[in-house]
């Protein structure tokens, strides 16, 4: 299988009271094209840090992130922002939708920032909302949506620009079990239907078992799970 995202010898160190705090130590990982991979690890293990590095939101202390065969280690902040905007979609535990805009507008705006015409952005946004069965809420603001509806809108926003990689940090962690299962099924179906590659952090091993592979963080390295 062809690699879409590679983490190579990733190290991430912080300093706490003048002492180094090592979060990741020579961590390696390959996400293949079309794969759905679960990142299963307890709170505080470094899941969010790993996702932020993979998504070019945070620079590693050492190592390289290779996206679609392109090294990102020495890219400028502007270059990293452009790569992230075009190639990476994010979904978080809390939706982070813009409260003053409707569900539809929340999906249109990132596309227009990326350079899409409004008519094209609106058409794609409506198709995504329809696919995720939340089109009837298109003109409602986030505060008027249920938790599950908010997350489905957030998923639509994350994939609207046509990224090659989707990164999700506990996307169902704030939902009840029934809604969580529904949102996960919607997310995984969209990933498979669109040919995306996805790395999804979750505490839910039942959901993780439905993905192609499972990884965890052990002794500050990335380890495959059965």
UniProtKB/Swiss-Prot annotation:
A single cellular component GO annotation: plasma membrane
Alphabetically ordered keywords of this record: ATP-binding, Cell inner membrane, Cell membrane, Membrane, Nucleotide-binding, Translocase, Transport
UniProt domain ABC transporter: residue ranges: 5-225
Enzyme class: translocase
Positions bound to ATP: 41-48
Classification via Pfam families: ABC_tran
Xref: PROSITE patterns: ABC_TRANSPORTER_1, ABC_TRANSPORTER_2, LOLD
MF-aspect GO terms: ATP binding; ATP hydrolysis activity; transmembrane transporter activity
Subunit structure: The complex is composed of two ATP-binding proteins (LolD) and two transmembrane proteins (LolC and LolE).
Family assignment from sequence similarity: Belongs to the ABC transporter superfamily. Lipoprotein translocase (TC 3.A.1.125) family.
Protein name: Lipoprotein-releasing system ATP-binding protein LolD
Organism of provenance: Bartonella quintana (strain Toulouse) (Rochalimaea quintana)
Lineage of origin: Bacteria, Pseudomonadati, Pseudomonadota, Alphaproteobacteria, Hyphomicrobiales
